[in-house]
Structures are given as structure tokens and as C-alpha cells.
UniProtKB/Swiss-Prot annotation:
Zinc fingers, C3H1-type class: 415-443
Name of the protein in its database record: Zinc finger CCCH domain-containing protein 30
Keyword set, alphabetical order: DNA-binding, Metal-binding, Zinc, Zinc-finger
UniProt region (Disordered), positions on chain: 444-469
Domain of life: Eukaryota
Keyword S-adenosyl-L-methionine: no
GO molecular function terms attached to this record: DNA binding; zinc ion binding
Alphabetical list of InterPro entries matching this protein: Znf_CCCH, Znf_CCCH_sf
Composition bias type Basic residues, residue spans: 449-458
Length: 469
């Protein structure tokens, strides 16, 4: 097979006859033929050069012979008409065409108002010119009061009522009210003094004296506030600064004890803890103090207003602070005293040199009695939701559940509407919780139960109708 193949060889002409030939149509552009304009001209020039040489036609293939030269390609430049160049005329603007400064425009009025509104000052010499003429020197000395700045409320209207109910209501007492205090330590029958005996002058009763003076000062301050001293803004709140000054001044404390009158007691056969009653013509006060000492607990039946006040004692820490609860029981119900029954005779108690309390004790006492106690959400809304607390054993001295309920009702300043909450028992739930202004009734049927009832009725009707058919 190798011998049957024919070998192909390329032979070149001699060096003198070797030339480069490019073939393309005259209608085709150099870009379409794959040539640039310079290559096109060079190809044409080389082709004409070889065509003009001797024996050029013999070396060219048939059809590529050179054309006879013609003189028609010569152009006479003198026969071509020429146009003389003329410079264009210069643009000359007339005087009437000049644009004015804008007297008829609207911006000129705004600019004139801006110029007239700017303050002008004339300075006789350059040294009198301030660094910044637009900034007054009085601005540095001026002090702005931030209290005059109005506060923009950020709480929505629907959340405002809930926030008001969470806060403790202001202390608003009518003409007849009772202040009942219950001691944290129950008094047994063995620790009570004899019925007919009198307490000696050397026996000191520090908690009772401090509580009596404090309750008396509180009542005096409340009466002064109700008479109009603070009726403009906080007519029902207690001025703690004034109360602190009264308790710190022995002369003022003695004067208040004289004005309020003696202390008397009322007893009840069904009570378990003794609570002395401080009487004032308009109100009734029932107060007692805890027993901070385990060896003796004394009860007092009267008070001698002629004795001097106890001197202040700074080196002794304050004892336990009694609590005072505000309630409004009916006027026909008697004062409830907790403790064993005592005879009606009330022997007088003569106070000797009773050591006083320190400044820290009075501050703590004012803070304890002057502040408003916040009710728990269950205590605030338990009466309305129908959730009544069962009476249990007394803790920390004990207090009657009825008195607690009365205090809870008296502290509830706003009456809740009986309209049920639309979000309660729903999949999303009420976001206000116990502070919601609407009624949360757990016994009401939910939306799912209502839908189930409707669905069951429809199924029952469909079954009956299918059976008939």
C-alpha cells in the first residue's frame, strides 16, 4: 500500500520569478476580504509592478493579464470648481438685548426679604467687632430651665389605664375612717400585765411611745392637709419633710400629743391580740406595735400628755417597724381588737425617762407609714373576678380577711367595666394580663368551644337528612 501512494511535492520557482499574489474581487471591501486598507494598496501596487515588468503576463495564470494603460484616470485639477472661504460675521449683541438683574422674578422678592430680615450693626472701629456678630454674648450667660420642657407621652391610650391601676392610688380619706394596726407578735395571757395593777414609772415602753407619737403626727398632718394646706396639688398625700421635722422637734411632738388628747382602749371578747385605740374627735385609730424583745411585752392603757418628750438616742439601732393598714369598715361595726379580754378599767401609765429614737429610726418610720402600699394583682382584681381568698390562719400577728378585702376595695380607685375582654382565652391571649381594664372571665366559653358546638350541630343535621333520603 505504501508503494501505491503517490508522493506530493511542492516546487518553488527560481528566485527572480518568485512573487506574491493575492486574489480578491474588486467589489469586496478590504475588511470583507480579510485585508486592511494598507495591505490592499500594497497588493495592488505589487500586482501592477509585476504586471508592468517583462514577461509578467507569461508567469500569470490565464485571466490575470494586465489591462492596457489608459489616460482617462488622470484628473485635471483646474477643471474642478473651487469655493472661496469666507469668515462668518461676528455676533454682535444689541444693548436692548442685555439681561437685567431679575427685577420681575419671584426670587428677587425672597432675597429682599432675607436682606431686610438680617440684623445690621454699625461698629465705630474694628476692635469693637465681635468674633461672630450673629451670636449674641448673652447666650453664654443664659440658662434654660429643663423643667419647663413639655413631656410628650409615649404610652398609648389603651395602656394608660392599665398603668394607672398598677400604681398605688392616692390616699383620700373621708371624714370618718379607721386606722387599724396589728402587731406582728401575738401577746399571750402570761405576758399581759395584771388587770387592776398599774405599771411602774421605771418600766420603759419604747415601741408603744414611738408608735403613738408617730400615729399622732400622721393624723395631725393628714388633718392639716385636708384643711387646705396642700389642697392645690397633693391634698391627700403626706408631707414627709414636715413629719420628719415634727418628730425631730421635742416641743412640737409634745404639743401634738397634748392636742390630740388621751389614749383609750376598746376591747372585744372574740379578739386574740390586744390593739390599743387612739381616739380623735373625727376619726378612730386602732394601733399597736410589735414586741421586739422576747422577755417582756407591755401594753399601755393611757398616756400622760404633761410629761416631757423622750430625749433623742443616737447610739441605738431602730427596732422593727409596725405596719398601719387603711380600711373603711361600716360605722356600725365595733373596733376589732385581737387578744384576750381585759376589764373595762383602764389604769393610767406614767412614763418616766423614756429613751428616744435616732434620726434613722424616724426616717424609716416615715417611709414605712407615709408611703402607699402597692396591692398585688390578685388582691386588686380578685373581688371583681370572683376569686375570693379563703380565710386561713393568721400570719405575722394576723389580720382579718374581711379587713383585707375592705382595704382592697377602698384602694381600688377605678371601677372596672363588666365588659368581657375579647382577647382573654383566645389563641393570642391578652397582653395586659391582670392589669387589663376589661373583665377576664374564665367561666365564659371560648371561641373554639363555640365553633365545636356549631360544627357538631351541622354534622347532626347532615346525618338526619341523609337517613331520610
Amino acid at each position: 500500500m505504501m508503494g501505491s501512494r503517490r508522493s506530493r511535492r511542492v516546487s518553488w520557482a527560481s528566485g527572480g520569478n518568485l512573487c506574491k499574489v493575492r486574489l480578491f474581487l474588486s467589489e469586496d471591501s478590504p475588511s470583507q476580504a480579510g485585508l486592511r486598507p494598507q495591505d490592499n494598496l500594497q497588493a495592488k501596487g505589487s500586482w501592477l509592478l509585476h504586471a508592468a515588468g517583462p514577461s509578467s503576463d507569461d508567469s500569470l495564470p490565464p485571466g490575470f493579464e494586465s489591462l492596457p494603460p489608459s489616460n482617462d484616470l488622470k484628473i485635471d485639477m483646474s477643471q474642478i470648481p473651487l469655493i472661496r472661504w469666507k469668515c462668518p460675521p461676528h455676533i454682535v449683541l444689541e444693548q436692548d438685548w442685555h439681561i437685567v438683574a431679575g427685577e420681575e422674578s419671584r426670587e428677587i422678592e425672597i432675597q429682599n426679604e432675607r436682606i431686610n430680615g438680617a440684623l445690621e450693626a454699625i461698629y465705630p472701629r474694628p476692635s469693637n467687632i465681635p468674633p461672630n456678630p450673629f451670636l449674641s454674648l448673652d447666650v453664654k450667660d443664659a440658662h434654660y430651665d429643663d423643667s419647663k420642657t413639655l413631656l410628650v407621652p409615649l404610652i398609648p391610650l389603651e395602656d394608660d389605664d392599665a398603668s394607672d391601676q398598677l400604681e398605688g392610688p392616692t390616699l383620700d380619706l373621708p371624714s370618718h375612717y379607721n386606722i387599724t394596726g396589728v402587731s406582728n407578735t401575738p401577746v399571750s395571757a402570761e405576758q399581759q400585765p395584771p388587770c387592776g395593777g398599774a405599771i411602774s414609772s421605771g418600766f420603759t415602753i419604747e415601741p408603744q411611745a414611738a408608735v403613738s407619737a408617730t400615729v399622732t403626727a400622721i393624723m395631725q398632718t393628714i388633718q392639716s392637709n385636708q384643711n387646705g394646706s396642700m389642697a392645690d396639688q397633693n391634698g391627700s398625700t403626706i408631707d414627709q419633710e414636715l413629719l420628719f421635722k415634727i418628730l425631730s422637734d421635742p416641743s412640737q411632738l409634745q404639743r401634738l400629743m397634748k392636742e390630740c388628747g388621751p389614749v383609750r382602749h376598746e376591747q372585744s371578747a372574740s379578739s386574740s391580740v390586744v390593739a390599743p385605740l387612739v381616739s380623735i374627735p373625727p376619726p378612730q385609730i386602732t394601733a399597736s406595735s410589735p414586741a421586739p424583745f422576747s422577755d417582756h411585752v407591755g401594753t399601755f392603757h393611757g398616756m400622760n400628755p404633761t410629761l416631757p418628750p423622750p430625749p433623742p438616742m443616737m447610739n441605738r439601732p431602730p427596732s422593727t417597724i409596725p405596719s398601719v393598714a387603711m380600711n373603711h369598715p361600716p360605722s356600725s361595726s365595733p373596733a376589732m381588737n385581737f387578744g384576750s379580754a381585759l376589764p373595762s378599767s383602764s389604769p393610767s401609765v406614767n412614763f418616766g425617762s423614756v429613751p428616744g429614737r435616732g434620726v434613722g429610726y424616724y426616717k424609716t418610720l416615715i417611709h414605712q407609714h407615709g408611703g402607699e402600699r402597692l396591692e398585688q394583682p390578685f388582691e386588686q382584681h380578685g373581688m371583681q373576678f370572683g376569686m375570693y381568698r379563703q380565710p386561713g390562719p393568721p400570719q405575722n400577728g394576723g389580720i382579718d380577711a374581711m379587713n383585707g378585702a375592705a382595704a382592697m376595695v377602698s384602694r381600688d380607685g377605678k371601677v372596672r367595666p363588666m365588659k368581657p375582654c375579647a382577647y382573654f382565652n383566645s389563641p393570642k391571649g391578652c397582653r395586659n394580663g391582670a392589669s387589663c381594664t376589661f373583665l377576664h372571665d374564665a367561666s365564659a366559653p371560648t371561641r373554639k368551644d363555640h365553633q365545636k358546638q356549631k360544627g357538631s350541630k351541622r354534622i347532626k343535621l347532615d346525618n338526619t337528612m341523609g337517613g331520610r333520603n
